[in-house]
C-alpha cells in the first residue's frame, strides 16, 4: 500500500470514528431529555417506571388544591377520570392554573407523590394538549361518556 492510500485510509477511519462518536453523544443527550406522557392510571399501573422523569397529564381535580398561606409549595391531585395522583410543586404556578382544567406536569415519583419540576396549564377554554385529549378520550370511552363531552376540549 502506497503512502497516499494509507493516509487516505486513516482519514476515512478518523471521520468514521468522529461520526460514530458524535452520533452516540447526540443519542445519549436526547435519551436523557425525553419525557413520555402518562395519565394517573398508567402511572399507578407502573407504566412510567421507577425513578424515571416523565410528564403527567390530566385534569386538576376539583377541591384538591392546597397551599399554606405565604408558602410557595402547592399540593393538588391530577385525575384522568379513573385514578388520581397527588402532585407537589414548589415553584410559581402558571396564571391559568385552576381546578378542573387540563394540566401537564413534568417530574418524578417520590414516595407515592409526583414531584413536579414544571407545570403547564391549558391556555384557553377550547384547547387541551392533543396527547392529554387522546388519553382522556380513552378514559371517556371506558366509562361510556358521550362523545360531545370529549369533543369540546380537543384541538382539531
From Swiss-Prot:
Listed SUPFAM superfamilies: Heme chaperone CcmE
Compartments, record wording: Cell inner membrane
Ligand binding (heme): 123, 127
The keyword Cell inner membrane is assigned to this record: yes
Residues passing through the membrane, by range: 9-29
Origin: domain of life: Bacteria
UniProt KW keywords: Cell inner membrane, Cell membrane, Cytochrome c-type biogenesis, Heme, Iron, Membrane, Metal-binding, Signal-anchor, Transmembrane, Transmembrane helix
Principal location class: membrane
GO biological process, alphabetically ordered: cytochrome complex assembly
A single GO cellular-component term on record: plasma membrane
Region (Disordered): 135-156
SS bond list: none
Family affiliation: Belongs to the CcmE/CycJ family.
Biological role stated in the UniProt entry: Heme chaperone required for the biogenesis of c-type cytochromes. Transiently binds heme delivered by CcmC and transfers the heme to apo-cytochromes in a process facilitated by CcmF and CcmH.
Protein name per its UniProtKB record: Cytochrome c-type biogenesis protein CcmE 2
Species, as recorded: Xanthomonas oryzae pv. oryzae (strain KACC10331 / KXO85)
Underlying gene: ccmE2
Amino acid at each position: 500500500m502506497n503512502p497516499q492510500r494509507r493516509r487516505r485510509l486513516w482519514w476515512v477511519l478518523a471521520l468514521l470514528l468522529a461520526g460514530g462518536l458524535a452520533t452516540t453523544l447526540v443519542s445519549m443527550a436526547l435519551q436523557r431529555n425525553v419525557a413520555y406522557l402518562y395519565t394517573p392510571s398508567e402511572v399507578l399501573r407502573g407504566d412510567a417506571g421507577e425513578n424515571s422523569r416523565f410528564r403527567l397529564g390530566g385534569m386538576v381535580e376539583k377541591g384538591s388544591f392546597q397551599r399554606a398561606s405565604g408558602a410557595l409549595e402547592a399540593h393538588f391531585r391530577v385525575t384522568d377520570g379513573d385514578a388520581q395522583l397527588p402532585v407537589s410543586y414548589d415553584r410559581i404556578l402558571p396564571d391559568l392554573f385552576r381546578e378542573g382544567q387540563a394540566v401537564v406536569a413534568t417530574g418524578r415519583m417520590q414516595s407515592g407523590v409526583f414531584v413536579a419540576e414544571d407545570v403547564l396549564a391549558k391556555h384557553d377554554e377550547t384547547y387541551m394538549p392533543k396527547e392529554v385529549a387522546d388519553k382522556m378520550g380513552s378514559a371517556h370511552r371506558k366509562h361510556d361518556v358521550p362523545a360531545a363531552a370529549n369533543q369540546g376540549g380537543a384541538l382539531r
